[in-house]
Amino acid sequence: MTVLSQAHCEACRADAPKVSEQELADLIRQIPDWRVENRDGILQLEKVFAFRNFARALAFTDAVGALAEAEGHHPALLTEWGRVTVTWWTHKIRGLHRNDFIMAARTDELAKGAEDRA
């Protein structure tokens, strides 16, 4: 369990600062299996989780959704047979905030507990 996975999101405003390059470098080391993607100039965190079947992938999607609702911070989720792609970024600031790294770490913790993962 990481420090990030024990943290909670803070309310984010449209004028909240994006993570700096140094913060990005420090935070990504705490979630090494996540990739930083640049989509139309917007940095995002992304990871693909593998499962044995669609039912397990869907259950994980539901668990991530429940976590997102509890924290008030929501990812893009793509659920397919045997896999779920999770993408975190902060829509209000069109980039990465510390909240995204917290949620990525907490998503990893959910995955560790997912039953019958491939």
Swiss-Prot record:
Gene3D superfamilies linked to this entry: Transcriptional coactivator/pterin dehydratase (3.30.1360.20)
Keywords from the named record: Lyase
Biological process per Gene Ontology, one example term: tetrahydrobiopterin biosynthetic process
CDD domains assigned: PCD_DCoH_subfamily_a
Pfam families: Pterin_4a
GO molecular function: 4-alpha-hydroxytetrahydrobiopterin dehydratase activity
InterPro entries per UniProt: PCD_sf (IPR036428), Pterin-4-alpha-carb_dehyd (IPR050376), Pterin_deHydtase (IPR001533)
Reactions the enzyme catalyzes: (4aS,6R)-4a-hydroxy-L-erythro-5,6,7,8-tetrahydrobiopterin = (6R)-L-erythro-6,7-dihydrobiopterin + H2O
The enzyme's E.C. designation: 4.2.1.96
Family: Belongs to the pterin-4-alpha-carbinolamine dehydratase family.
PANTHER family: PTERIN-4-ALPHA-CARBINOLAMINE DEHYDRATASE-RELATED
Protein name as it appears in the record: Putative pterin-4-alpha-carbinolamine dehydratase
Species of the source: Azotobacter vinelandii (strain DJ / ATCC BAA-1303)
